[in-house]
């Protein structure tokens, strides 16, 4: 709708209450280029929003994390569970969200408190192991059995595991009939200490969008799907 787009580009401040958010719209770049600020209020239960209201201290924490990420040549993710993932960060687009927008031409979402990088093409390789208790935001549930991603040049080339979680993941991704559904979208980590690990158990799936889990302090974030910076 050209008239709607024109109105948005002429607005100084936009409050986004849509289900998925303007951040996933192809028109967003044009809107931000006009100097408009977009404040996305994530589709979360009101109690989540009240617990994770904007925190002034988060801004410096997130900005510091973004700075460190941008200065790094690579990211290596390892743990005793078997994960060994290497990510090339050279010339990677990295952004941080602290929960509000205070600069023209920027977009933020509430809740905030995370940093994410969008790796360039052929930048992600290794093994990512999900164990019981890890969080699967695709299905808004906790893993109950082991799932292993084998990743080569950004793409999940094999999914290992004998439990329900592996079966669901294989079936879900196969349903897209699209190789890029298996490609790395972004990686990052959470920085919001107010986020609660057990929050997924407290709400119906329709009552949350999972932003709290993405911002969970200390949690590593790995996402597959679209990545415009890698041409996908």
Model segments located where?
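Compact functional segments
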Residues: 228-232
């Amino acid at each position: 709708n050209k008239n709607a787009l024109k109105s948005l580009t002429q607005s100084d401040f936009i409050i986004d209450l849509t289900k998925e958010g303007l951040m996933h719209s192809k028109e967003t770049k044009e809107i931000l280029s006009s100097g408009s600020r977009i404040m996305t209020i994530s589709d979360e239960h009101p109690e989540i929003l009240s617990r994770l209201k904007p925190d002034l201290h988060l801004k410096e924490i997130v900005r510091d994390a973004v700075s460190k990420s941008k200065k790094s040549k690579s990211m290596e993710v390892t743990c005793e569970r078997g994960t060994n993932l290497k990510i090339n960060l050279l010339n990677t687009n990295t952004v941080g969200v602290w929960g509000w927008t205070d600069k023209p031409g920027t977009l933020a979402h509430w809740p905030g408190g995370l940093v994410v990088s969008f790796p360039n093409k052929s930048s992600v390789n290794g093994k990512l192991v999900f164990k019981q208790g890890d969080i699967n935001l695709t299905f808004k549930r906790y893993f109950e059995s082991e799932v292993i991603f084998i990743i080569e040049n950004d793409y999940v080339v094999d999914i290992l595991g004998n439990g329900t979680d592996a079966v669901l993941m294989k079936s879900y991704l196969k349903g897209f009939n699209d190789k890029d559904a298996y490609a790395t979208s972004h990686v990052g980590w959470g920085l919001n200490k107010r986020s609660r690990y057990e929050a997924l158990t407290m709400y119906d799936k329709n009552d949350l969008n999972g932003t709290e889990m993405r911002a969970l302090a200390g949690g590593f974030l790995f996402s597959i799907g679209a990545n415009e910076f890698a041409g996908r």
